[in-house]
Amino acid sequence: MQFSRDWSRLAATGNLDSILNGWAEDAVMMPPGLPPLQGKDAIKQYVEAAMKLPGFTISWEPVSVHVARSGDLAYMIERNTTTLKDSTGKQVTTYGKVVTVWRKDSTGTWRNVVDMWNDAPPPS
């Protein structure tokens, strides 16, 4: 779970290359209300556009992780928090529940291969 926390901290830096490094080349992102984004190039376009939104920030925290016996595949349940400014300039915060699938690559680095989320109520 620590690599997901570290990745969340990287997202706060705004360094696009560092952020994109967390996804595998063949990753699939499934944002709410959109068709699946296939591959790192499509994910890059989505992330780049999000980062340009006024006041945009995102962070997430793993809730649980389940690793396959093989040790090279895992899934996480996570919560995210996204903030941006609406058309009037008011700051709006939304919350999401997230399922991510991770695969260990040939260098032993965990990479996100499936990233899917939808809306959640605010934390209590």
Each model region followed by its residue ranges:
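A beta-strand edge to alpha-helix "cap/lid" segment located at domain peripheries
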Residues: 1-21, 28-124
